């Protein structure tokens, strides 16, 4: 093996080690990366999402408390507690509702490395259950780290079954919502600890029982910072275009019947 090949192997090996050392840090909040945390590592990740802006007043805070566990060098799992607090206009007055939204279990498998391989590749599965609904979220993750640039793409399918008791009987009616998304994100490392970029998200929803469907585009900046002990990532994601909407959204440039005009998400991570 000549000197050039040796230097190439050493550079790739060193880059892979550096990437693994910061694998727990998320540089995006809506877009997943293929990296997993180290075996035996446990991390706490509180996640807060602000959703605001509908035709009438609407503001909601969605909180997820995640406990992430590294199982092997390629596999991790996580457990979530999900909560919300929503204030909105109802019957000409503001009302606030807060509650527990169930639990979730995540599994992520890393198949290829975004530094050592031509591209990173991962598979993601998340199961969620609440008192009256069940969700299954699956996605394919493709990403690449090249110098100071990191790019990532996700394709997601998420069916959700809602179970509604029928009046005056013990029967339960089920309602299926099918969500699918395509995410594209890129960020530039201005320093090893700090990156600045953009996330683009195409969100699609189909509700079979109501013949309701929409397709919208979100896009906005993302910034991330990591220290030795903790990291934080923030995305500001306005809805920028309605690609397709149902009759309820006719005459509007955005979809506000089911979605909001603005989403802001912060994720904070710390090793336990």
Q: Residues of each region from the PLM?
A:
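Cleavable N-terminal export/targeting peptides
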Residues: 1-26
